[in-house]
């Protein structure tokens, strides 16, 4: 029996990390390497950063548009971060799950906790640790996107998140990108193989037990 022809139960894979730890590079590569994994593209009211594109990195919307989406209950979760709003549009996520496909969230801590509270066993929480706060600070200064005040807030928030590491199913140290990516890919593969996400196995077992020896 070819298991590729049998339905899976999709999962919500949430990857959380402080800014400057490499989360975006890890998640984009995972989606690129796995055709059955879809990236949840968040809507945000913040301005695009250099190199970001609407519809690929984020859906960049006005505050009025975001408020309208809130009124329509269009988000699975939403949050205000550093004065800007972020939200995960519900419709594409539900569509992917209905096809038995999985959805990857490149998401912040509070957003991940909200989704996990709603999705329960259908969600998997992964936290990416920096090798040190000093290295994280160096990366944030190197990319020259934030003021000193914002960088300080990001570092303080990172310490608060790291203190909550036990709330996550998996924790990955990103001191080597290729190794961290391999760990993330292994987590995704293992979660997809779980019995609860492969309902077709029950029918296969029933057929096997009916066979004469």
UniProtKB/Swiss-Prot annotation:
Annotated InterPro entries: GK/Ca_channel_bsu, Guanylate_kin-like_dom, Guanylate_kinase, Guanylate_kinase_CS, P-loop_NTPase
Recorded GO CC terms: cytosol
EC number: 2.7.4.8
All copies of domain Guanylate kinase-like, residue ranges: 10-189
Main location class: cytoplasm
Reaction(s) catalysed (UniProt annotation): GMP + ATP = GDP + ADP
Alphabetical list of SUPFAM superfamilies matching this protein: P-loop containing nucleoside triphosphate hydrolases
Enzyme class: transferase
Cited PROSITE patterns: GUANYLATE_KINASE_1 (PS00856), GUANYLATE_KINASE_2 (PS50052)
Keywords: ATP-binding, Cytoplasm, Kinase, Nucleotide-binding, Transferase
Subcellular location(s) of the protein: Cytoplasm
CDD domains: GMPK (cd00071)
GO molecular function: ATP binding; guanylate kinase activity
Record Gene3D superfamilies: Guanylate Kinase phosphate binding domain, P-loop containing nucleotide triphosphate hydrolases
Pfam families: Guanylate_kin
Top-level taxonomic group: Bacteria
Residues annotated to bind ATP: 17-24
Function: Essential for recycling GMP and indirectly, cGMP.
HAMAP family referenced in this protein's UniProt entry, alphabetically: Guanylate_kinase
Family: Belongs to the guanylate kinase family.
Record's protein name: Guanylate kinase
């Amino acid at each position: 029996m070819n298991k590729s022809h049998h339905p899976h139960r999709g999962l919500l894979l949430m990857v959380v990390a402080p800014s400057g730890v490499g989360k975006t590079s890890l998640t984009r590569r995972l989606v690129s390497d796995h055709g059955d994994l879809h990236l949840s593209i968040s809507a945000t009211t913040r301005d695009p950063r250099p190199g970001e594109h609407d519809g690929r990195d984020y859906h960049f919307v006005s505050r009025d548009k975001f408020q309208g989406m809130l009124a329509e209950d269009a988000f699975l979760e939403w949050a205000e971060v550093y004065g800007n709003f972020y939200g995960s549009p519900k419709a594409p996520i539900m569509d992917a799950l209905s096809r038995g496909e999985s959805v990857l969230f490149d998401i912040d801590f509070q957003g991940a906790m909200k989704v996990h509270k709603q999705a329960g066993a259908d969600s998997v929480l992964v936290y990416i640790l920096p090798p040190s706060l000093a290295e994280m600070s160096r990366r944030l200064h190197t990319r020259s996107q934030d003021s000193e005040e914002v960088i300080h807030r990001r570092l303080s928030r990172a310490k608060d998140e790291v203190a909550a590491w036990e709330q996550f199913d998996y924790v990955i140290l990103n001191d080597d990108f290729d190794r961290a990516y391999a760990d993330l890919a292994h987590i995704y593969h293992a979660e997809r193989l779980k019995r609860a996400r492969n309902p077709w196995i029950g029918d296969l077992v029933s057929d096997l037990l009916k066979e004469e020896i």
